[in-house]
Amino acid sequence: MSTSNYINSFAPAKINLGLRIFGKRKDGYHELQTLMAPISIGDRIEITLLSSGIEFESTGDFDVPKDSSNLALKAALLFLSHHGLKTGLRIKLTKIVPPGAGLGGGSSDAAAVLFSLNRMLAIDETMENLIRLAAQLGSDVPFFLLRKPALCTGRGEILHPTSSFPYPRKGLLIYPGFPVSTPWAYKTYDELCKKGLILPSPSQESDKPVNDLEEAVFSKYLWLPAVKKWIQSHFNPEVCLMSGSGSSVFALFSKEDPRFFNDLIQQAQAYLGPGCWIRLFEILEQF
């Protein structure tokens, strides 16, 4: 819903259908290849234009920073500064996506703010320029501007939209109730590679999608491989992976029968207990 001074946007989470790492770059980032897809679970961003001042409010299922370290607010400040605008804003974030879960919630919020302000303020910035601006906020932010599945390379900011998606659309998503730090995950991966405890990507060819960060994250958070093994042994998914740098684990199924998914989520809730955030979702081909 939008008017000239108000817009209400959906900011979907994403999953990574594989994440391959091809070494560390001179700028400190890692060279990546990952297929990312938006899903039907997401936050909501409401923006109202004001005569002056910047107001930010966050409600919902999870607490997030309410200062300029929040990516949604940071995106708004960057957009206004980039275009030399003094417009006042009220931003209301309804937080549904757990932070620190490898689901890109903060990045999606930032992209939704950039996309919305570009429309509301009639800037008509090109997608290329918006993506360039988004890359200043984080490696995953450009992907959410594309609004469809994409193969992402570089540090994740180089986008290759995909028209063919070879995986099932329906799945189960589990957040264990604790976050994983992305810098820690990559640092641990590098350390384990140096010790020869993890083989680099070229040595790990696979017919199915692989997340190269799993071994690093699983080495500390033993609950995650246990959950992945439980899903694989009980429900035989087509794909079961940790998303991004964790901590969420997801599974995709080719089943269509609603009874299967009802049984799936009931068994997951019974096995994992009330401390886990468990949801069914669908992959979005466009949003």
Swiss-Prot record:
Leading EC class: transferase
Record-listed ATP binding positions: P98, P99, G100, A101, G102, L103, G104, G105, G106, S107, S108
Swiss-Prot/TrEMBL catalytic activity: 4-CDP-2-C-methyl-D-erythritol + ATP = 4-CDP-2-C-methyl-D-erythritol 2-phosphate + ADP + H(+)
EC number: 2.7.1.148
Protein name: 4-diphosphocytidyl-2-C-methyl-D-erythritol kinase
Function: Catalyzes the phosphorylation of the position 2 hydroxy group of 4-diphosphocytidyl-2C-methyl-D-erythritol.
InterPro entries per the UniProt record, alphabetical: GHMP_kinase_C_sf (IPR036554), GHMP_kinase_N_dom (IPR006204), IspE (IPR004424), Ribosomal_Su5_D2-typ_SF (IPR020568), Ribsml_uS5_D2-typ_fold_subgr (IPR014721)
PANTHER family: 4-DIPHOSPHOCYTIDYL-2-C-METHYL-D-ERYTHRITOL KINASE, CHLOROPLASTIC (PTHR43527:SF2)
Pathway it works in: Isoprenoid biosynthesis; isopentenyl diphosphate biosynthesis via DXP pathway; isopentenyl diphosphate from 1-deoxy-D-xylulose 5-phosphate: step 3/6
Similarity comment text for this entry: Belongs to the GHMP kinase family. IspE subfamily.
Stored NCBIfam families: ispE
Entry keyword annotation includes ATP-binding: yes
GO molecular function: 4-(cytidine 5'-diphospho)-2-C-methyl-D-erythritol kinase activity; ATP binding
Bridged cysteine pairs (disulfide): none
GO biological process, one term: terpenoid biosynthetic process
Active site: K14, D140
Gene that this sequence comes from: ispE
The species this protein was found in: Methylacidiphilum infernorum (isolate V4) (Methylokorus infernorum (strain V4))
Stretches of the chain forming a coiled coil according to its record: none
A Pfam cross-reference name: GHMP_kinases_N
Keywords on record: ATP-binding, Isoprene biosynthesis, Kinase, Nucleotide-binding, Transferase
